[in-house]
From Swiss-Prot:
Subunit and interaction comment: Component of a complex required to couple retrotranslocation, ubiquitination and deglycosylation composed of NGLY1, SAKS1, AMFR, VCP and RAD23B. Interacts with HOMER2. Interacts directly with VCP. Interacts with BRCA1 and BARD1; interaction takes place when BRCA1 is not autoubiquitinated bur is strongly enhanced in the presence of autoubiquitinated BRCA1.
A cellular component annotation (GO) from this entry: nucleus
Function, in words: Ubiquitin-binding protein that interacts with the BRCA1-BARD1 heterodimer, and regulates its activity. Specifically binds 'Lys-6'-linked polyubiquitin chains. Interaction with autoubiquitinated BRCA1, leads to inhibit the E3 ubiquitin-protein ligase activity of the BRCA1-BARD1 heterodimer. Component of a complex required to couple deglycosylation and proteasome-mediated degradation of misfolded proteins in the endoplasmic reticulum that are retrotranslocated in the cytosol.
Protein name as it appears in the record: UBX domain-containing protein 1
Acidic residues: bias regions: 42-52
Region feature Interaction with BRCA1, mapped onto this chain: 43-297
Length: 297
């Protein structure tokens, strides 16, 4: 049975002649399977139908056509050779085999593309899970840092309160000891006096207490309040700075100047007062201040 050439087989399967010749040429004329692989891999290339610069007949290794031969010797030799002619049944059988081969190649290509798509999807999901895990870890770290900061601030506040309580207890003990010693040193009335009217004990003038800390509560314009413990010798400017840093406005916004007022007696503190210590301003051991927006001068 005569066989179709690779070029004829590709044309029989529906490939354009120019594309089939190009496939055979670029695969080194290694057969129909190699040419079919090339055709399926490059069917979407924009230049798949562009002709090669080298004559395809030289690359394919086929004999030149009678019109390409020069001289009477060429035409005579072409006329003397006869090409085997396939019967219709042989042509159909060979075409069937080629179509089955094309279908097999197509299935292999689809399976390969499906595997690649599945692998890309797995990669996408894996990257998504890694990104989600990284975001969750970042959120957990932020929550943990915020909780640690709150615990630290609360511990500092409790420690400050404890120091104030201990100071108060020490002062009470000192006063009690001093007061008790004065009463014990007084002489009792003579026994011969039948019934002297007891005189009230002489009151010692209260000892002026020196505080080293003061507790300031600041009421903000929105109704909220801030409470903080300062050293008695700190300047009032430290309180104003604390208010400006903690009054809850968004970072980056223009903040109005802060004006501090005392509730009772009513008093507006000036810029000169900002340089004076809290003890000198009468804000020790505790005081309530009011924040008002300072009108620009």
């Amino acid at each position: 049975m005569a066989e179709l050439t690779a070029l004829e087989s590709l044309i029989e399967m529906g490939f354009p002649r120019g594309r089939a010749e190009k496939a055979l040429a670029l695969t080194g004329n290694q057969g129909i399977e190699a040419a079919m692989d090339w055709l399926m891999e490059h069917e979407d290339d924009p230049d798949v139908d562009e002709p090669l610069e080298t004559p395809l007949s030289h690359i394919l290794g086929r004999e030149p056509t009678p019109s390409e031969q020069v001289g009477p010797e060429g035409s005579g030799s072409a006329a003397g050779e006869s090409k085997p002619v396939l019967t219709e049944e042989e042509r159909q059988e060979q075409t069937k085999r080629m179509l089955e081969l094309v279908a097999q190649k197509q299935r292999e290509r689809e399976e390969r593309e499906e595997r690649e798509a599945l692998e890309r999807e797995k990669q996408r999901r894996r990257q998504g899970q890694e990104l989600s895990a990284a975001r969750q870890k970042l959120q957990e770290d932020e929550i943990r840092r915020a909780a640690e900061e709150r615990r630290r601030e609360k511990a500092e506040e409790l420690a400050a309160r404890q120091r104030v309580r201990e100071k108060i207890e020490r002062d009470k003990a000192e006063r009690a000891q001093k007061y008790g010693g004065t009463v014990g040193s007084r002489s009792s009335p003579p026994a011969t006096d039948p019934g002297p009217v007891p005189s009230s004990p002489r009151q010692e003038p209260p000892t002026k207490r020196e505080y080293d800390q003061c507790r300031i509560q600041v009421r903000l314009p929105d109704g909220t309040s801030l409470t903080q413990t300062f050293r008695a010798r700190e300047q009032l400017a430290a309180v104003r700075l604390y208010v400006e840093l903690h009054r809850g406005e968004e970072p980056g916004q223009d903040q109005d100047p802060v004006q501090l007022l005392s509730g009772f007696p009513r008093r507006a503190f000036s810029e000169a007062d900002m340089e004076r210590p809290l003890q000198e301003l009468g804000l020790v051991p505790s005081a309530v201040l009011i924040v008002a927006k300072k009108c620009p001068s």
